[in-house]
Amino acid sequence: MTTTIPTSKSACSVTTRPGNAAVDYGGAQIRAYLHHLATVVTIRGEIDAANVEQISEHVRRFSLGTNPMVLDLSELSHFSGAGISLLCILDEDCRAAGVQWALVASPAVVEQLGGRCDQGEHESMFPMARSVHKALHDLADAIDRRRQLVLPLISRSA
């Protein structure tokens, strides 16, 4: 089922399936779901100057909470230079809110970022992961490390 929803700047269409709706902004389909470790936002299709503002608005909603976020762009077929603003805004929002996030990039995204993503996850402009599975695994590891730091403090106070 597809429904067109008018917004203040443009119209988007929403395609629903049981339990998960995809929102379409001019060639980019956005789907989000809550995993127990993070909110995973997947964007397929194309991000360009014509739709990046609407996509940014939609994606920013998921960075305003306290849940970590994985932005999955692995299935993007086109990512213009205008899309970098989406990543910069998301990075700023997450840093300001203290929310951990990770980017899963397609070859089109890697190309726009100057190929820096394939040099390793620690040398890129943004927090990178090779897959959603790897991003969620890294988040689980980070939670375990924080727990290990806190456990000695708890046992001392008891």
From Swiss-Prot:
Disruption phenotype: Disruption of the gene enhances resistance to osmotic stress, increases resistance to several peptidoglycan biosynthesis inhibitors, decreases peptidoglycan thickness, enhances antibiotic resistance and activates genes in the SigF regulon. Induction: Highly up-regulated by osmotic stress. Also induced during oxidative and starvation stresses. Residues 28-139 form the STAS domain. The modification Phosphothreonine is found at T2. Phosphorylated on Thr-2 by the serine/threonine-protein kinase PknD. Also phosphorylated to a lesser extent by PknB and PknE. Dephosphorylated by PstP. InterPro entries: STAS_dom, STAS_dom_sf. Regulated by PknD under osmotic stress. Keywords: Phosphoprotein, Stress response. Belongs to the anti-sigma-factor antagonist family. Interacts with Rv2638. Phosphorylation abolishes binding to Rv2638. Part of a signaling pathway that enables adaptation to osmotic stress through cell wall remodeling and virulence factor production. Unphosphorylated OprA forms a complex with the anti-anti-sigma-factor paralog Rv2638 that dissociates on OprA phosphorylation by PknD. Phosphorylation of OprA may stimulate the release of SigF from an inhibitory complex and enable the transcription of osmotically regulated genes, such as oprA and the ESX-1-associated virulence factor espA. This is Osmosensory protein A. It comes from Mycobacterium tuberculosis (strain ATCC 25618 / H37Rv).
